[in-house]
Design a protein with these regions (language model features):
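Generic secondary-structure signature for well-ordered alpha-helical cores
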Residues: 9-20, 35-39, 140, 147-154, ...
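Intrinsically disordered, low-complexity, positively charged segments
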Residues: 2-66
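Flexible glycine/proline-rich
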Residues: 2, 22-27, 31, 36, ...
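Helix-rich terminal scaffold detector
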Residues: 4-5, 169-297, 301-307
């Protein structure tokens, strides 16, 4: 049996990142992945502006000024933020300005009003300043032609402000990936319908769908398919038409109605791995058809969810080139004993907080869903190991 890392690496080698781009409104671009480099088409600021409320001056006109020997300048105009008027420079003159307002040509500094007598027709300057003081040059923040953001950037709120400052409203972003879910098994029924004898409700698809949509992944197709080989083929092909990734659940083991291995083979899918060194979820299958990954998971809820968490997010991160989709792996100190020793590597459901990890008290079975409700991670347990309180263990947080 292959190690999980080997299985994942082999699957990633068979698919290519999705490079389709679409344009969305700036108001819809946050949390998307930038599809193109952004190059500034203008200077920021686009005009010389004041960084303070005060008086625009020629710095040399303040030479020698202090509170004992103030310099008096004549006020020849007043500009507020949003005004743009050329007021020619005259020696010994100043223009009243506010923070963000235009500074006319010929003036090269702004004396803050606290260093003056707040004069209205003429102003006394109490401090000598140098050129550039409280003065923002054209392009001081951003130069025209400068690359501002690189393709692949995960856009955050601060990026929205940056794009808006450049006047950009339509933003090129990578198309969101789509993942369809096909739940197989004649025993499955959809929630909201009366449960018939011998049937169970389909729970796995709703866990997976919620997890994906929470991260912005579209799920165009979620359906149940009974154990019928020809119908399974039809449904998988239908999924491939609208999705970049297909997830199936159930039918991957060796029972008479476990049809997925045969169905995938007859469809011409290239099997990348099966029967990895892991419990639960040993019979998980990774395959590729029409250049798209198909991840076939166990029909047991925890087995399906744990292996989904391990494989899917790394696959999604690779296809989108979005590192934020990668899972968080770290180490923690175990609080509870886990005496069960396994021949295979094992994913043990758990709850981690502040560097410590605890185990649920209920039965640890791949078909048991109820004791997952308080879990936020699994322990990645090496084969042949018995866990004791105080042991340091590897964990992977759920997305």
């Amino acid at each position: 049996m292959k190690e999980l890392e080997e299985c994942l690496e082999a699957l990633l080698a068979e698919v290519k990142p999705i490079e389709k781009t679409e344009y969305v409104a700036l108001t819809d671009a946050c949390d998307r992945i930038l599809g193109e480099d952004i190059v500034a088409q203008m200077m920021i600021p686009p005009y010389p502006k004041s960084a303070m409320d005060g008086y625009a001056v020629r710095a040399e006109d303040t030479s020698g000024a202090d509170r004992e020997h103030p310099v008096t300048l004549q006020i020849v105009g007043e500009l507020f933020a949003g005004d743009c008027a050329e007021i020619p420079y005259e020696e010994g003159c100043a223009v009243r300005v506010m923070t963000g307002s235009y500074v006319p040509e010929g003036y090269d500094a702004v004396i803050r009003q606290e260093d003056t007598d707040y004069g209205e027709k003429q102003v006394q300057i109490y401090r000598e300043i140098t050129a550039g003081t409280n003065y923002c040059c054209v392009g001081e923040d951003i130069r025209e032609g400068e690359q501002i953001l690189a393709r692949g950037t995960h856009l955050r709120a601060l990026h929205m402000g940056l794009l808006a400052s450049l006047g950009i409203y339509k933003v090129p972003v990578c198309e969101r990936i789509k993942c369809s879910i096909l739940s197989t098994g004649s025993e499955l029924m959809a929630p909201g319908t009366p449960l018939l004898p011998g049937k169970i409700y389909n729970s796995i698809a709703y866990m997976l769908r919620a997890s994906m949509e929470r991260q912005g992944i579209q799920v165009p197709f979620t359906e149940i398919c009974r154990d019928d080989k020809e119908l399974l083929k039809e449904k998988i092909q239908q999924c491939l038409k609208t999705a970049d990734i297909v997830i199936t659940t159930g039918g991957v083991s060796v029972g008479k109605k476990d049809l997925l291995p045969e169905v995938l083979e007859e469809l011409g899918a290239k099997k990348i791995f099966s029967h990895a060194n892991i419990q639960p979820g040993t019979p998980t299958i990774g395959s590729v058809l029409d250049g798209k990954a198909i991840l076939s998971l166990s029909g047991n809820p925890y087995a399906a969810y744990a292996n989904f968490e391990y494989y899917f997010w790394e696959l999604a991160a690779y296809l989108t080139q979005d590192a934020s989709l990668k899972v968080r792996r770290t180490q923690a100190v175990l609080s509870d004993p886990y005496p069960k020793v396994n021949k295979l590597r094992r994913f043990v459901r758990a709850y981690a907080e502040e560097g410590r990890v605890t185990l649920p008290t209920a039965v640890h079975a791949s078909s048991v869903l109820s004791n997952m409700r308080d879990c936020n991670c699994f322990i990645d347990m090496e084969p042949g190991r018995e866990l004791h309180p105080g042991d340091e263990v590897k964990i992977q947080y759920f997305k």
